[in-house]
């Protein structure tokens, strides 16, 4: 009787063990069938393997099929790019990923580009529109002219792919006209590259040779003029704004003279500009021991909230002070960037010899950026009181926040409030890297050794109980 009871107990344990193992096998098979977005969690500090909400806005709006061709030889696949493409594949039924091995299809890329195509390059296509994404546009390399060293510093796969998708599905892209004829600065390399990435077409124009802003302008950029516009040009720009036009202005102090006609665009709408260089003596509001390199308070708005959410700081060097007052015009004026109460404007401008307050200097606080909107006709003017906001050096000092601020401003102007800039992701950290042999050992331990050990322990317990029962 005791032996029969022990046998039943042992049989029960074996059956239970078998059932548990069967459940584990089924769960494992089910888990492998799930998409990577469900089974994998991105714990990297820069969310290297994650898709941002900006991409989801673009992808979820797709109504046409988009094909992403992954040009790569067998065995040369980049793991990060592969995981990123898996994310896009699971994000929408309108996106298809197709791998093209150049050894098998040696002429495939010729119809898209004349460049020599490296492994892990991509081609995004929708209908008769396409864009080629070079591997060097995905892994961004930077270097130092002083050290001669260059290396891969950031991963821009998501930004490049999402930009390409947006480009191929939209035949009409925003167009920015750049005012010239007043010694305006050239666009910085970083700014120009970002405009291309954001699919914004650019064209220069002069109001000296035409009597109005071109009809196909989505907005006009006035970038760091060194001399003033004429009264006639000012009237044309004001008429453009009053009739629903969009303006983005980055204009700070000039080394000699003033820009009264240009800044009268602001004063007509209740914003006064002081002709000087703002210094801020509050240590929390300037950088690099230079009180004219300002770190203003970022005020909450649709344009600035993405920076606030990520705790970024804008750096605004050599700026004029703006003061928001009253106006009889039907406009709303929103301050985007502000100094501390300890700021003042140095009347000496570029010729200042001291940061101390002197006679003739104007007390702050000041706004350094404003957003002026019209309720009646959707006119909008965003104005930053520094000519160096997207200068490559100062943008680098801000960790890219300055460029993000300007690109968010452009998104606001062209009505793409959700499609703000997608930042590249830094690679300046240590990876957790394991070899293939270590990976194989871990798989063997998890899939083979652990279940066998579990089964062996169960058998040992059954045998021990049986012997104990026999002894009794």
Regions found by a protein language model. Give the residues of each.
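Short, surface-exposed patches at the edges or C-terminal ends of soluble domains, predominantly
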Residues: 2-472
